[in-house]
């Protein structure tokens, strides 16, 4: 049973670019690959991810719950001030 739960958790985990819900923009990063800031942001309590790194100058997260939005947010374009 435990193995099945682990497998289901892995299959159902979401991944994608972390997005700022207010602006609709990706979280930017400069240090590609392993990135402490991206990892910290992805693992934050309000995000719920298991791992994060910098990919194509934006934070990519793995192991996100389905409830965490990823870029792009449908119907919302990236707007900065």
UniProtKB/Swiss-Prot annotation:
Keywords: Disulfide bond, Ion channel impairing toxin, Neurotoxin, Secreted, Signal, Toxin, Voltage-gated sodium channel impairing toxin
Signal peptide: 1-13
Tissue spec. comment: Expressed by the venom gland.
Keyword Secreted applies: yes
PROSITE patterns: LCN_CSAB
Compartment(s) of residence: Secreted
Keyword Signal in annotation: yes
Propeptide residues per the UniProt entry: 81
SS bonds (residue pairs): 25-78, 29-54, 38-59, 42-61
Biological process annotations from GO: defense response
Superkingdom field: Eukaryota
Gene3D superfamilies: Knottin, scorpion toxin-like (3.30.30.10)
GO CC terms, sorted: extracellular region
Domain LCN-type CS-alpha/beta: 14-79
Pfam families: Toxin_3
GO molecular function: sodium channel inhibitor activity; toxin activity
Domain-level remarks: Has the structural arrangement of an alpha-helix connected to antiparallel beta-sheets by disulfide bonds (CS-alpha/beta).
Family note: Belongs to the long (4 C-C) scorpion toxin superfamily. Sodium channel inhibitor family. Beta subfamily.
Function: Beta toxins bind voltage-independently at site-4 of sodium channels (Nav) and shift the voltage of activation toward more negative potentials thereby affecting sodium channel activation and promoting spontaneous and repetitive firing. Is toxic on insects and crustaceans, but not on mammals.
Protein name: Insect-toxin Cn10
Species: Centruroides noxius (Mexican scorpion)
Phylogenetic lineage: Eukaryota, Metazoa, Ecdysozoa, Arthropoda, Chelicerata
């Amino acid at each position: 049973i435990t193995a099945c739960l682990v497998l289901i958790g892995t299959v159902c985990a979401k991944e994608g670019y972390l997005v700022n819900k207010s602006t609709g923009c990706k979280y930017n990063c400069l240090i590609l690959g392993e990135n402490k800031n991206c990892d910290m942001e992805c693992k934050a309590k309000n995000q719920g991810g298991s791992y994060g790194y910098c990919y194509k100058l934006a934070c990519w997260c793995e192991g996100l719950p389905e409830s965490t939005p990823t870029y792009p947010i449908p119907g919302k374009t990236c707007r900065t001030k």
